[in-house]
Amino acid sequence: MKTASPHIIQEGSVQYQLGELKGNQIIYDFPQMLIYLEAKGKLLFGKNFKIYSEDEAILYKLCIYFIRDFEACKKIGIDPNKGVLLSGPVGCGKTSLMKLLPHIVPHQNQHTVVPARNITFSFNKSGFKIIEDYGNNGFYCFDDLGVETIGRHFGKDCNVMGEILLSRYDLFLKRKLRTHATTNLN
């Protein structure tokens, strides 16, 4: 990716123009973004990846969030300065979307998708350092939040993800560092 053209993304021999550069601002084109997202989805998740028309409304909201279109976000009641909580039934593609969408803005800081249960397993092995590691820095999307077990380290029980989210909320208040999550819970 050339920094002079962050709206043009090269995947193999194909170039995807997601919008137009006007001055120092990118005017994104949602249909072009969908074309790119489907192509990138096939590269990341396999040839059967498909964006369905019924998913376009949520994709539009997520796209304007990720491209930081403050005006469009305001119109539909999204606060682009807060994190995303994406909920839905098992297998509907929440994790795939949170892994896919950052690719439309490769010039921005990217979050790391981490399964919440893996964090709890790490806590069981390594203890409270894990809460510190995830609670004090980094840009994360916690995947499948709410289905992880209670952590236990040397006989001491802990709601690991609850503690991490409290720490990350403090981080948000102090440094405006956003946290994303996916969940199957209502």
PLM region spans:
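Hydrophobic positions on the alpha1 helix immediately C-terminal to the Walker A/P-loop
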Residues: 97, 101
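Walker B catalytic acidic pair
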Residues: 143-145
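Conserved glycine(s) of the Walker
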Residues: 91-94
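A short, basic N-terminal segment
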Residues: 1-79
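Short glycine-rich substrate-engagement loop in P-loop NTPases that contacts/grips substrate
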Residues: 102-137, 152-158
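Hydrophobic anchor at the beta1->P-loop junction of P-loop NTPases
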Residues: 86
